[in-house]
Structures are given as structure tokens and as C-alpha cells.
Amino acid sequence: MKKNRLNLNGVVVINKAKDISSNKVLQQLKYLFNAQKVGHTGTLDPMATGVLPICFGRATKIAQYLLDADKEYIATIRLGIETDSGDAEGEIIAKSINIPELSAEYLETVLAKFRGDVVQIPPMYSALKYNGQPLYKLAREGKTVEVKSRNIKIYELELLEFNIDSLKIRVKCSKGTYIRSLAIDIGKTLGCGGHLIALQRTQSGPFKLSEAFRLEQLKDLSFEQKIASITNIESVFIDKPIYSLLEEEKDDLYKRGLFADKPHLDGTVRIYDVEKFVAIAEFDKGKLINKKFFDQDILISE
């Protein structure tokens, strides 16, 4: 007889291993925790490793916040070889022996072109859709379509190391950034082509690799230890400012969903009632435009 699944609420930060899909990680986690409802916050390619936050129960309501959050990666680019997918899993489509002589100074001039606001074309092998069809399905059928460019932001781009035909970089970027496309574009700028051979996500929103669990670690934990690995919903917003409700504002907010204009508030704000986190609110130049209520104390609900 199947055990009743638990209605858990919160986030588990996984350190995804190589060669496993994000969906498989999600399903294994659902089984390990006997959880009723789980959801991910954007996938990592099977070849990629690193931070993959998984939301449980009520935390699935705020998955979009993590999808929209900034990310940080460590990426290794192989020069002189291009693949159809832009990474090591694709078929080789071009080779070049004209790899320029690399130096830290030369590579810095190249990387400088990709810092700040960047227009990027996503790769064909991606989950983006064209007329309702995922691009990767069209690519596997040998079809090519015009992929619309998108505006992204690369906040930090640091050269970590390099050798005769490869370089390793650290990238801190906005949502929607494809590191495979960045690898392709860097290869083109160097005049020899290139593709991504390793990718590790080191941060997603507030969650860092140092606090992530490997699936193998979780399998060895007791039930109590597994529950302790779930971080609360507020942790998703730990870098957001706090607004403490005034006594006279509580009825308007709780009973009528109203909130007086707050000219000094903008963007995402944590709402506190005394010392308790109760909601996330979105403000646009002081006007409340969206809100979500949470019971921070409930980790396992009925």
C-alpha cells in the first residue's frame, strides 16, 4: 500500500551531478521525501552540474522568482571546434587550426566586449519554442529557423585560467542568458570558433553551491535530517528589503487586500507582521501591484 505523500513546504538546494536531467533529479527528490508536490526553478542541461533549487508545496508558488533571479556559472570553452548544439554533446560541424596565440591581456579585450548589456541569440538546441514547438525538437529533425535575439545582462565576466586551446571563465548574469551562446560568440570573436565543454552553476538567486546537497547525501539521511535540509520560503527573498506592517494597516491588507501607497518602496519587498514573515509584495513606484501570503512556520501542512 502506497504511503500518503507529505505536503512539504520549502526549498531544497541540490548540487546536480553530470549526465542526469533536471527532471530526473526532481522525480528522485519527490520519491526520497515522499513529497506531494514538487517543482523546479528552471532546468540545467544534463552535462551541466551545480545549483538546482527544487520547490516543495507552497514554495512552488514562488518558483518564478528563482527563474527570474540572477545566476552565476563557471564555464570551460574549447576553442577551434564548433558543434551544432554549442556544447560537447553535439555533433562537430566545423574545425579550425587558426586558434590565435592567447594571453591574459588579449583575452581580457575579448571578454570586455561581453560585459554589460548584451544582445544574444539563443542556441537552436534549447527549450524555447517556435510556433509551439521546442527548438531542440526542430533541431533534432535537422530544421533551422530564425531564432529571435534577446537582451541579457552580464554583470561580471572573469577569466579564471586558459591554455593553448581552451579557457575557463566565471559568469554572473541575468535570467535568459545562455552560456552555450556565450561560448559560441567568444569563439567567433577569437576567429576560431568554440563550444562549451563544462558548465557548473555556482549560484541561483540567493542559493550558493556551498549550501547545496548531492542526491547521494540526501539518500543517506534519516527522515528528520531530510526535513532539516528544507530551507524555508523566506530564504528565496533573503536579499530583499523588509517592511513591517503598522497596526492600522493589518486589517486593510489581510481582509481587503489593500495597501496604502508607499512612495519609498519599489520592486520585491518582504512583509513582516511584528517579527514574522507573512507575505511577499511587489511594488511599482510605491503602488502595490501583487502580493503572496505565506505561513512561514508551516513546514509540513495538512
From Swiss-Prot:
<dbReference type="InterPro" id="IPR014780">
    <property type="entry name" value="tRNA_psdUridine_synth_TruB"/>
</dbReference>
<dbReference type="GO" id="GO:0160148">
    <property type="term" value="F:tRNA pseudouridine(55) synthase activity"/>
</dbReference>
<comment type="similarity">
    <text>Belongs to the pseudouridine synthase TruB family. Type 1 subfamily.</text>
</comment>
<dbReference type="Pfam" id="PF16198">
    <property type="entry name" value="TruB_C_2"/>
</dbReference>
<keyword id="KW-0413">Isomerase</keyword>
<feature type="active site" description="Nucleophile">
    <location>
        <position position="45"/>
    </location>
</feature>
<dbReference type="InterPro" id="IPR020103">
    <property type="entry name" value="PsdUridine_synth_cat_dom_sf"/>
</dbReference>
<dbReference type="InterPro" id="IPR032819">
    <property type="entry name" value="TruB_C"/>
</dbReference>
<comment type="function">
    <text>Responsible for synthesis of pseudouridine from uracil-55 in the psi GC loop of transfer RNAs.</text>
</comment>
<keyword id="KW-0819">tRNA processing</keyword>
<dbReference type="Pfam" id="PF01509">
    <property type="entry name" value="TruB_N"/>
</dbReference>
<dbReference type="GO" id="GO:0003723">
    <property type="term" value="F:RNA binding"/>
</dbReference>
<dbReference type="InterPro" id="IPR002501">
    <property type="entry name" value="PsdUridine_synth_N"/>
</dbReference>
<protein>
    <recommendedName>
        <fullName>tRNA pseudouridine synthase B</fullName>
        <ecNumber>5.4.99.25</ecNumber>
    </recommendedName>
</protein>
<dbReference type="GO" id="GO:0031119">
    <property type="term" value="P:tRNA pseudouridine synthesis"/>
</dbReference>
<dbReference type="GO" id="GO:1990481">
    <property type="term" value="P:mRNA pseudouridine synthesis"/>
</dbReference>
